[in-house]
Amino acid sequence: MAFLEVSVQCQGRSQARYEEVLESFGALAVTLLDADADTVRERGVFEPGVGETVLWDVVVLSALFPVETDALGLLAGLEGAEPGLDWGGVRFRVVVDEDWERVWMDQFQPMRFGERTFIVPWNQAVPVEASGMDAAVVRLDPGLAFGSGTHPTTGLCLRWLDRLGGDGVLGGGEVLDFGCGSGILALAALKLGAVYAVGVDNDPQALLASRENALRNGVAERLEVYLPAEAPVRRYPVVVANILASTLVALAERLAGCVAPGGRLALSGILRGEEKEVLRCYAVWLDVLGCEEEDGWIRIDGVRRC
């Protein structure tokens, strides 16, 4: 099925007015995106307080209309609907409603991270190069959750875990994956030698995907997943958090408190230019061992002071 997509950029404080006008003209759905996404100005919006409506400074609204909608007629109607709204930058395009899971599976291929770690779509064969070695193979179907290995932040964390596994740091230990998404990092840690893992995410779809992927990999009894408010309070020898920099800063005390003395912590989801603020916040608790960058994204890793 096809739709006519109408996109317009506006100030966050005006978003509701634009959305109301689009809906009054028959919009089937309206989505909001950060106009500064994937830039140093990107700002995560998480769990606003009661009564708060927190939006980005500049918002892109995308509305879907029936494909047969007259674009020029719609534009004329929008421009005359409410004084003070600027529709000069509006864009129209036809989009096709696809089976996104199938599209993703068709495009997703096995990937290797570091020496031993392989991420393999659940419906594909294990690569030949993994068969003759002590490979850590994770069978994955991310579903609606983040984490397939294709994003640089995930890859940075997987290579870090692979190194810890090679150095024997994971052997027999426990791992906390904060912001677990599909469970990819927790599962990789288990395959690399960790005895037990805990995944935490504020998205119930992520917890479901993590459980299903744990079953798919035969480690369901060694992985527990929780919403943040329900997660057990304890310390772990290894903690990895692949979320946005603003959230890493906001949760610095909590995340650092989850790391056992002498334990390892990796922080990712940090855009170039944001790392100084993250380093400043965690310097209270950590001795920083290094930073690694890929495609403008950065991972910071350190050791918890005793």
Curated annotation (Swiss-Prot):
It catalyses: L-lysyl-[protein] + 3 S-adenosyl-L-methionine = N(6),N(6),N(6)-trimethyl-L-lysyl-[protein] + 3 S-adenosyl-L-homocysteine + 3 H(+). This is Ribosomal protein L11 methyltransferase. NCBIfam families: prmA (TIGR00406). The gene is prmA. It comes from the Bacteria. S-adenosyl-L-methionine binds at residues 154, 179, 201, 242. GO terms for molecular function: protein-lysine N-methyltransferase activity. One of its GO terms (cellular component) is cytosol. PANTHER family: ELECTRON TRANSFER FLAVOPROTEIN BETA SUBUNIT LYSINE METHYLTRANSFERASE.
